[in-house]
Every structure is written in structure tokens, then in C-alpha cells.
Amino acid sequence: MKKLLSIFLLLGFMLLTANISDAAVNSYDQYGRKTGSYRETSTGYNSYDKNGSKSGSYRKTSTGYNKYDKNGSKTGSFRKTTSGYNEYDKYGRKTGSYKTGSNGVTTKYDQYGRKTGSFKKDSSGRVIEYDKYGRKVGSYK
């Protein structure tokens, strides 16, 4: 049964809050070349590079997600807010935020509140990522 994924483009890239109805999601660059994938686990999500090697993980917490590298070391976290998520580094310093509007567009901001990009689902169900100028930089499906 397909489950609703909340993917964070954490960015390092990943953790966006775009909802994709599948247990596995692939990421692509602006030219359509596969760059990685995300798979749902019992505790959250694992991320993989384009060759299928595990590159990190995201584990659910009571307030959001913790982010770990491939060796299991914590590298940051995401905490749920009323409009999306705030992102923090491993020391607890805020590094950015993701806010989803009523139009379904998720906008990414840096720690100073400046827009750095956005995510929007298209008619085919893909989530398209744009930079702050509105140029397509990647997609998720």
C-alpha cells in the first residue's frame, strides 16, 4: 500500500514538505538525470546516491525529523511548525525554513528569512524544485 511521504529536501538538500504518494521517490537534476532516491522506513526515510549507496537518513521524532549521515552521526534536524518546518544544524542553530502556502507551493528560506527556492507539484504528480529566480533546478517523482 502506498503511503504519503513528506519529503524534506534537506538539503543539504532534502526535506521538503511536498507530498508524494509512494514509498520511494527518485530525485533528478534539471536535465532529468537521476541524482538519488529516498525510501520510507519504519522510522523515517533513508537517502541514497545515484548509484544506490546509502547517503543518509531521516528519523521521525515527536517534533519533526533528525538528520544523519551515512555513518549514523547526527547532522541536523527539522522541527514542524504551523506552516512547515524549520531546519537546524547539529548544534541546534537555525539554518533555514520551509513554508507551505495555501496554493500548495513550498518555499525555502535561509536563516535570515530570505527566499532561496521553492517546490511545486505539477499535473503529473512530480515535485519540481526552483531556485529563487524561478529557474528549474530539479525534480522528484
Task: Locate each region found by the language model.
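Repetitive, compositionally biased segments used for assembly/scaffolding
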Residues: A23-K141
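Sec/Tat signal peptide C-region and signal peptidase I cleavage site
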Residues: L16-A23
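Positively charged n-region of N-terminal signal peptides that target proteins for export
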Residues: M1-L4
